Amino acid sequence: ALLDPTTSLWTQMGNPFHDFHYIGNDEAEKEKLKRLKQDWSGISKQLILHHKDYDHLDPEILCEAEVTDGKITIGNASYSVLILPPITNIETAAWEKIKLFLEQGGVVIANKQLPYESIEDELIEQEILDTFGLDQSTRSDYWKAFQGSYRKGQQNAYFIPSGDIEILLHVLKMHDHEEIHFETESGKKSFLTEKRKVSEESTLVFVSNQEEGKHHATMRVSYPCE
């Protein structure tokens, strides 16, 4: 699942009723909002282009989710990996749920920016930094486009300062063992895939080519098919 940076966009004066368009009058603040939105949509787009199934997860819904056996469960959906886009803050209740998820074996991959703003009475920045194995705030590095590999903190908490998609895919591969894998011989990213497990015995896979032309592709399934 990919966490929505809802409250981070709010604090940068993004209007949630109009696609988080900026409603303030500070150019620096406007640029920060633009950067947060671009990075969030960028992660989303790259996950789609690399055929990684995911759902968007609102922090308020996360607060109500059930966390057991290293999975976040919401209705019929469950997630073993939670990806955090760059965020400047997070609600305490959502952070408590993330901590529980990590304690139970879940995987959390944060990108570029960890929360540093306080939107509630409780200060949690240092606890978040400790969880991801960092000794200082990431706020200045993000706005300066810091580059680097990744840091593994407590349990399965990862922080990728550069937000490099290849590093994100590498960490995902370490923990997310795909039952169905699709790739083209040419490496073209014009294909979109959607996988839905309808029962323990049945999985539906939809593949669509968004461009013209023929391509050779391979689909691998990790279990016997009839």
Please annotate each region the language model reported.
Residues 1-226:
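Carbohydrate-binding surfaces of carbohydrate-active enzymes
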